[in-house]
UniProtKB/Swiss-Prot annotation:
This is Large ribosomal subunit protein eL14. One of its GO terms (molecular function) is structural constituent of ribosome. InterPro entries: KOW (IPR005824), Rib_uL2_dom2 (IPR014722), Ribosomal_eL14 (IPR039660), Ribosomal_eL14_arc (IPR023651), Ribosomal_eL14_KOW (IPR041985), Translation_prot_SH3-like_sf (IPR008991). Belongs to the eukaryotic ribosomal protein eL14 family. CDD domains: KOW_RPL14 (cd06088). It holds the Pfam family KOW. Coiled coil: none annotated.
């Protein structure tokens, strides 16, 4: 299983956003991360428990705390879709 780090693409596995892909933008502590859908899906930037996401092998190169515009540009450059 890939590690949860900044720029990692993940799938939400719990809650009403289950099945949606997100990007990890920041690591808050050992239990929570900041994720975003970057405006490409219905997931807004929010804190999420790491037990509620499943990391995927894909990763994009973004700085910690990147804006949604920076995330969207990095996703387009890497050719990754969150839809």
């Amino acid at each position: 299983m890939p590690a949860i780090d900044v720029g990692r693409i993940a799938v939400v596995i719990a809650g009403r956003r289950a099945g949606q892909k997100v990007v990890v933008v920041d690591i808050i502590d050992k239990n929570f991360v900041l994720v975003t859908g970057a405006g490409l899906n219905k997931v807004k930037r929010r804190r999420m428990n790491i037990k509620h996401i499943e990391p995927l092998p894909q990763k994009i190169d973004i700085p910690r705390g990147a804006s949604d515009e920076e995330v969207r540009a990095a996703l387009e450059k890497a050719g990754i879709s969150l839809a």
